[in-house]
Amino acid sequence: MNKKKILITGSSGLVGNVIRNGIHSEYEVIGLDQRNEECKTVHAVNSICLKEIAPFFEGVDTVIDLASNPSQFSPWSVIHENNLLCTYNCLQAAVDSGVKRVIFASSNHATGMYELDEPYNSIVSGNYDELDFGSLPLITTDMPIRPDGPYGIGKAFGEAAGRYFSDQDGLSVLCLRIGTVNKQNRPLDIRHYATLLSHEDLVRLVISCIEAPHDRKFGIYYGVSDNKWRFWDISNSMNDLGYSPKDNAELWRDTD
């Protein structure tokens, strides 16, 4: 039986490498990145040029779209000139080439301003004394977007563009509002005890998206591990996709 062909745009970054390493044994994986990497399955192209990337979409089952400047502190000029165009081009190339599904790497920063409100501000500050983690109101994907900067605005644009291509062209687009993923694969500050997405759970989430039913045409999902102080709702990730996180950031508490 032939393996599904998976294309990862922006494949040479941290998240791209985690996903590539985590799924390569199950799928035929090729990557695109503007950086020239000494890997025969990664091709050096720039996603801001539709003509450059289009040939690589032929025969692909699922695209994992990571191509963007990953810094949450990127100025609007970078988001406008790079991230928006990369996202739109990926969706357009997918439709033009008959790709079935795009997994769009959105971000928790599309709703980051909720962290100014209680109880979320107390959680990300580590002020747990007056909180009952068992009864926290969770932030759901049907709540209004509240971007916390140009980067978050760009991710909200990507979700909207994905909805358009899904409705207009029948493309399946699954948007992942990814939590905290870092090289160390552990919490590095107090906020991360709520927001960590471990490398292993990231791979689990991506595989669940790849294998989700074909009739799942659009969805927005938070990507986070099963952390005690998690305040993003992942019930739709579990119900729609079968995502089952295994890790909890509390395992790192008081280990330093």
Which residues make up each language-model segment?
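Conserved C-terminal active-site "lid" loop/helix of NAD(P)H-dependent oxidoreductases
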Residues: 218-244
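N-terminal Rossmann NAD(P)H-binding glycine-rich loop of SDR-like oxidoreductase domains
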Residues: 4-25
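Alpha-helical substrate-binding/gating segment
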Residues: 167, 177-185, 196-218, 226
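Conserved Rossmann-fold NAD(P)-dependent oxidoreductase catalytic core, especially the SDR/UDP-sugar
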Residues: 89-144, 148
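Conserved beta-loop-beta element that borders a ligand/cofactor-binding pocket
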Residues: 106, 149, 159-184
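Adenosine-cofactor binding site in Rossmann-like domains, unifying the SAM/SAH pocket
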Residues: 30-52
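NAD(P)H-binding glycine-rich loop region in Rossmannoid oxidoreductase-like domains
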Residues: 46-82, 93
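Glycine-rich NAD(P)-binding loop of the Rossmann-fold in SDR/ketoreductase-type enzymes
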Residues: 78-89, 97, 153-156, 197
